[in-house]
UniProtKB/Swiss-Prot annotation:
Main location: other
Chemical reaction(s) catalysed: ethanolamine = acetaldehyde + NH4(+)
Protein name: Ethanolamine ammonia-lyase small subunit
Gene Ontology molecular functions: cobalamin binding; ethanolamine ammonia-lyase activity
Lineage, broadest ranks: Bacteria, Pseudomonadati, Pseudomonadota, Gammaproteobacteria, Lysobacterales
Enzyme class: lyase
Binding partners and assembly: The basic unit is a heterodimer which dimerizes to form tetramers. The heterotetramers trimerize; 6 large subunits form a core ring with 6 small subunits projecting outwards.
Function: Catalyzes the deamination of various vicinal amino-alcohols to oxo compounds. Allows this organism to utilize ethanolamine as the sole source of nitrogen and carbon in the presence of external vitamin B12.
GO annotation, biological process: amino acid metabolic process; ethanolamine catabolic process
Pathway: Amine and polyamine degradation; ethanolamine degradation
GO CC list: ethanolamine ammonia-lyase complex; ethanolamine degradation polyhedral organelle
Taxonomic superkingdom: Bacteria
Protein family according to the UniProt entry: Belongs to the EutC family.
Length: 271
């Protein structure tokens, strides 16, 4: 009995055209085809690289300054990537010097802004490099449309989600938005997450935050993410809360177009 040189075609392999998830991989005997195995190894390597890639804030700072947006680069209490990965608690707080810098910035620019925006590398600086500038443009446009005041953008090296609480508190902001690189998956090394907190302050838990996840070309488009964010911000200001008490009940918009913004259809969504 001879072993087929090529794997038999799976009847549902066509679903791979609709999702980047690792489905319908096929088989050769009792094993994966060589191509699928190599693709897995590549995806795993890309995820590892995304975690360890150093955050390069210079292009983002240049883009912000070109737009006339004030910004400041700070460091969390984690001194380097190794400590950041070993001590998650240090990534949630600013270094003492950074906190002092932010107090000085607040003294110059004043406080009580409606929205503060933090950009942190998180577990994927690649996601920040690829998507943060575009999302900041969307947030600026949304704030201008709604009449919300914006604090200077705060960039944080070795930051985790909760660092937004300290930043927002020091800036005396009504809300804080954290744009952060999400933990890479095997098909998503560049996924950007967005976290919203009303009346940020040190010590809040994840229950106080709303999350908009998987912002990238193959996931949630910039326009769709901004649509959801606009709804959540308006409701947060109206109801004076965020987190588990605030549900995303935004109506699904008509196609929010833009060549780079339209995410591919998936079989999970209705036509």
């Amino acid at each position: 009995m001879s072993v087929p040189s090529t794997p038999p075609r799976d009847a549902w392999a066509q679903l791979r055209q609709l999702t980047p998830a690792r489905i319908a991989l096929g088989r050769v005997g009792t094993s994966l085809p060589t191509d699928a195995h190599l693709e897995f190894q590549l995806a795993h390597a890309q995820a590892r690289d995304a975690v360890h890639l150093a955050f390069d804030p210079a292009p983002l700072q240049a883009a912000l300054e070109q737009r006339g947006r004030s910004n400041i680069l700070l460091q969390s209490a984690a001194a380097d990537r190794h400590q950041y990965l070993q001590r998650p608690d240090l990534g949630r707080r600013l270094a003492e010097e950074a906190a002092a810098q932010l107090r000085g910035l607040t003294a110059v620019h004043g406080g009580r802004h409606d929205v503060a925006v933090v950009v942190a590398d998180g577990l994927s600086a690649l996601a920040v490099h690829r998507h943060a500038a575009r999302m900041l443009d969307q947030i600026d446009a949304l704030a201008s449309q709604e009449g919300w005041s914006l604090a200077p953008v705060v960039l944080v090296r070795q930051g985790r989600v909760a660092i937004g609480d300290e930043v927002g508190e020091l800036l005396d902001a009504r809300t804080v938005i954290v744009l952060i690189g999400e933990r890479p998956g095997l098909s998503s090394p560049d996924s950007l997450g967005l976290y919203l907190t009303y009346t940020p302050r040190v010590g809040l838990t994840d229950a106080a935050r709303n999350c908009i996840s998987n912002i990238r070309a193959e996931g949630l488009s910039y326009a769709e993410a901004t649509h959801k964010l606009g709804y959540l911000l308006r409701e947060a200001f109206r109801r004076k809360l965020s987190g588990v008490q605030l549900k995303d009940e935004a109506e699904q918009p008509a196609l929010l177009s833009g060549p780079a913004d339209v995410a591919p259809r998936t079989f999970l969504l209705p036509d």
